[in-house]
């Protein structure tokens, strides 16, 4: 994924490590990395407010994610906690779902937005005057 903003460069190394863990069949490390990366993204956007849960709430309230994305991010938080605290071993499908959500958030915040701003849209032609009804 091509990250094109200076802000995104702050977590690009972590993103590379997540993909390295994925490639090397290390799903626990990848899920923990995704959780860490998403928290970094939220802190960059809304500032540091302590907990992932508080970051997520404020991130949503600031309009960065929809209700559906909010719920998905909450599940990713739980998956990260389950890996760390409950011995959760994500399947390839689990990891794929986590990566899909992460990539969607990053793309929406750092790729699509910039790409859309760079569209070369021609100006609208002037409107013809309406014929008088007389």
Where are these regions (language model features)?
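Short, charged amphipathic alpha-helical segments flanked by flexible coils
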Residues: 43-79
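Charge-enriched, short contiguous segments at helix-coil
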Residues: 71-134
């Amino acid at each position: 994924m091509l990250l094109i903003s200076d802000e995104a460069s702050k977590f690009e190394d972590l993103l590379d490590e997540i993909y390295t863990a994925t490639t090397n069949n290390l799903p626990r490390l990848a899920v923990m990395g995704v959780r860490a990366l998403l928290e970094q993204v939220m802190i960059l956007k809304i500032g540091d407010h302590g907990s992932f849960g508080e970051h997520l709430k404020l991130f949503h309230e600031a309009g960065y994610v929809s209700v559906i994305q909010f719920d998905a991010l909450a599940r990713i938080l739980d998956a990260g906690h389950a890996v760390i605290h409950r011995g959760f071993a994500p399947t390839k499908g689990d990891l794929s779902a986590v990566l899909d959500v992460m990539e969607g958030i990053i793309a929406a915040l750092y790729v699509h937005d910039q790409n859309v701003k760079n569209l070369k849209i021609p100006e609208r032609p002037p409107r013809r005057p309406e014929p008088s009804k007389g």
